[in-house]
Amino acid sequence: MPDSYFISEKQHLPSDKYSSDGSHSFIFNKFLNSILPPNTHPLSEAATHHFSSEGKQLRAKIALSAGEKFGADTTACLHWASAVELLHNASLIHDDICDGDTIRRNNASVWAKYGRDIALALGDWMIAEAFEQAAKAAYVSNSFNLVTKLSNHVKSTIAGQALEFDNALYPDIDKYLEISAGKTAPLFVAAIEGIAEIAGRSELIEEINHYFVTMGVCYQFANDIQNILGTDGAASPSSDLKRRAPNAVIVYFRNFLKTPERNLFDSWLAGKSQNKANFWQRKITESGAIHEVAKEMHKLLKRAEGVSGTLPNDCIGVIAPIQKQLRNVCEQVDASCP
């Protein structure tokens, strides 16, 4: 297979990947832009619009940081980081269609600007390109389990998403945790697991998985609080409530209710009417549910910090910026809680 099929020049990744010069982000975005649909492609404009706001790119940063810490092949790392980041963005585009969200990263979501058909096609294109990038990472590094590993994580993510739609009744806390872990953790795990495979560090995978499951649920709790308060960037406060989507605050609120009022709430959740949505939103914000979820969020944060402290030093270096980001999100939630 010709070298031109891969990255044309092996670039050295700078040692301070989270420094203010943004070197990792620059290298990654330069590469990512090179593999997006070209100007003549019917999806080019939609792809450019979606990536005009880069987002946090946490999964790509995890992969590139792990690659540097573990001494993995740089070319393989860029291919793998791109695969995971493309899959994450495909899920965002498809989620926005499912959820009816018109805003993504302070811009119009792809479906809102270009229609559902283009958004579906762009998400599908990203999934296809992600597996091509994973195959290239596998070829460069002779790590031929990579594509299977990526496929397994994608299946886990989809299963978590499907659980959200599969519940005839609003989920209890156990079902909610299963949904949350399934939707959030797999692609974080994939980001570093693939690099561990490339670098021959597969002994890290079990503990990495434990960390990211805990971290992912903590982050989801924080996001759920922000959704109810209207500080998550969605077009309207409590969009999860209006869509009857799983949300930790709603789960805890439902548990607080006595049977007669819970039956009324369940009846409303089972319907599709937006009547009384504002009433139930007010009831939720006036209850102790937000504060209970915030307390659980901090317990999860502490647990994640405990797990991260048991990892080898080079792995702690990879996770530290993610842990800092998680703490920042929790602090933002604390500041916005009534």
Describe the residue ranges of each PLM region.
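N-terminal amphipathic/basic leader segments beginning at the initiator methionine
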Residues: 1-33
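Generic structural signal for well-ordered, non-transmembrane alpha-helical segments
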Residues: 185, 213-220, 298, 302, ...
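Hydrophobic alpha-helix feature that most strongly marks membrane-spanning transmembrane helices
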Residues: 220, 230, 255-258, 270, ...
